[in-house]
């Protein structure tokens, strides 16, 4: 079984508080990956970066003082047609940090042969969760499609992909 993890493809990361040009171009690629995963009876998992109103007083908020993905705001929602693609059998994980230990626990329980990650942003949440997935499932294939994730800085994107390759995550 394959698990597809769509990382933080949320309004605030596409065209909201921390959005950047080009993030919207991932929408169709992600939709195609979701459809492909479902066609092989895989498990689709979405993560949502999730903060409260007190975000600016948190450790992350003090280092990145841009309120974003505040639960209950439009910026917290999945972006565009990806939001419409969520089905009842999908799993949605709200995470208060870059990486999700809840995702690690879930992946251990599901024990997929392959975990593919896509979404935003490559050099923060995608890399964090890819490393967590590899640690949770050291014998499973963990992949990241370079064309299905992005970040505002193309050089940071490439550096993150290089780090992932270095820890035996397959960058395709």
PLM feature spans:
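Active-site acidic carboxylates
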Residues: 1-92, 109, 143, 158, ...
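Short beta-strands and strand-loop turn motifs
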Residues: 118, 142-147
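Secondary-structure boundary elements
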Residues: 38-40, 113-114, 136, 140
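Conserved N-terminal glycine/acidic-rich loop preference
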Residues: 92-128, 150-172
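Histidine-anchored nucleotide/phosphate-binding helix
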Residues: 32-36, 127-137
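Short, catalytically relevant binding-site loops at active-site mouths
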Residues: 51-53, 75-76, 98-100, 149-151
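Short, charged helix-to-loop "capping" segments that act as catalytic/coupling loops
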Residues: 87, 131-144
